[in-house]
Amino acid sequence: MTTPAWPRLPHPEIAVVPTLLLGWVLVQVAGAEGIPVKPYNLTWKSTNFKTILEWEPKPINNVYTVQISTALEDWKSICFSITATECDLTSEMAPNVQQTYLARVISLLPNSTGFLEDAVYSNSPEFTPYQETNLGQPKIESFKLVGTKLNVTVRDTQTLARSNGTFLSLRDIFGKNLQYMLYYWRSSTTGKKTAMTNTNEFLIDVDKGQDYCFFVQAVIPSRKDNKKSPESITVCTRLEKGKFREMSFIVVPVILVIIVVIALFLLVCKCRKAKARQSGKEGSPLNIA
């Protein structure tokens, strides 16, 4: 494969041995002499297509400008004369996440205008968001356990990638290439079972009357690296027990009230009967033999 002919600065890049110790020494010397410090350790940080370029060192007497390009485009400046050591390049990649990008960090003196001969810069590694962005932690949107069927729905994660002004979800971008793995087990055991789907929904057979725990993981099998996401939060079914507990909070007090009412009613009736018998005895004539 032919290496893309990336746009270049009109002056040669100064070679620096990429070691942390030498980099620190050069930073101190450059800072003392008022020379722009050459950036190093350029690293891409990307999750669900939110992409940030990071580098070192923190500036002393210099500022940074970040540029980005593709093999077929000129360099475009994004972050101008900043003192931070990171630049968010998401918006530049969002319209075409399958393109391969190259960035460079240019170090300048604070009062420099334009790209002068004393500016120094470093190129980033090439980066293709579609292949290299990390998959974020998925979220279980809903679940339902009915009889012997467990239905689990995974939330369709939205990203900052877009097409025709519309933001895309992971499913929009990867289609059937995005799969989810469900790990599930009876809450009373530890042995896990798995199920795979290329949609966002699972419907699996389970044992009736048992509670289950489960989590999901996003997977892109076609990738060489970064195939799997972190595991989602583990959740467990408690639907039937939950309903029983909710009903008990209502039914038990009602039953107690009914029992009290019945007891009071019986007590009142008993008192009335006793009073009636007492009145009858007092009104009867004496019987003298």
Swiss-Prot record:
InterPro entries cross-referenced by the UniProt entry: FN3_dom, FN3_sf, Ig-like_fold, Interferon/interleukin_rcp_dom, Tissue_factor, Type-II_Cytokine-TF_Rcpt
Record topology, Cytoplasmic segments: 269-289
Ranges annotated as spanning the membrane: 248-268
Disulphide bridges: 79-87, 213-236
GO terms (BP aspect): blood coagulation
Main location: membrane
One GO cellular component term noted in the UniProt record for this chain: plasma membrane
Compartment(s): Membrane
Extracellular side: 33-247
UniProtKB keywords: Blood coagulation, Disulfide bond, Glycoprotein, Hemostasis, Lipoprotein, Membrane, Palmitate, Signal, Transmembrane, Transmembrane helix
Family membership: Belongs to the tissue factor family.
Subunit comment: Interacts with HSPE; the interaction, inhibited by heparin, promotes the generation of activated factor X and activates coagulation in the presence of activated factor VII.
Residues bearing glycans: 41, 111, 151, 164
Record protein name field: Tissue factor
Its membrane topology: Single-pass type I membrane protein
Motif (WKS motif): 44-46, 75-77
MF terms in GO: cytokine receptor activity
Residues carrying lipid (S-palmitoyl cysteine): 271
Signal peptide range: 1-32
Entry keyword annotation includes 4Fe-4S: no
Function: Initiates blood coagulation by forming a complex with circulating factor VII or VIIa. The [TF:VIIa] complex activates factors IX or X by specific limited proteolysis. TF plays a role in normal hemostasis by initiating the cell-surface assembly and propagation of the coagulation protease cascade.
